[in-house]
A protein has these predicted regions:
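Membrane-interface coil-to-helix junctions
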Residues: 22-118
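Transmembrane alpha-helical segments of multipass membrane enzymes and assembly factors
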Residues: 121-122
Length: 122
């Protein structure tokens, strides 16, 4: 197999994964800046918590994550953020995207990118 064939195969796989990500989250792409995907859950607890935790992580990044474990959502308890689903790399991506497209759209783009990346490595 030549390098050109491998590149073509990766391009096709990438297109398929992008299409599947868009299809499984439809109509997210049409409402990227004003809606969040909640899937088939009856309550949006996880997406809303993620939409809170990503800005928290982004806020702590300039401080080298100092105080990250003491998230104000769990106040007055200290260190309890460690019991959550920590997403430092996702928080970094959110910190870069949020100023450009807003928090809700950044969350949607990160969700789509995560689905595409998940498909690419399986």
């Amino acid at each position: 197999m030549t390098a050109r064939d491998r590149n073509r195969r990766w391009a096709v796989r990438g297109a398929v994964h992008r299409a599947v990500a868009v299809a499984t989250t439809f109509p997210l792409v049409a409402h990227l800046g004003d809606r969040i995907a909640i899937g088939r859950e009856p309550a949006a607890t996880v997406p809303f918590f993620n939409l809170w935790s990503l800005p928290w992580t982004a806020q702590r990044l300039p401080h080298l994550l100092h105080g990250w474990w003491d998230a104000p959502i769990f106040w007055p308890a200290r260190g309890t953020y460690a019991n959550s689903e920590l997403q430092p790399l996702t928080g970094l991506a959110f910190a870069l995207l949020r100023p450009l497209i807003g928090p809700v759209a950044a969350y949607g783009v990160i969700l789509l990118l995560a689905l595409v990346a998940n498909g690419a490595v399986t």
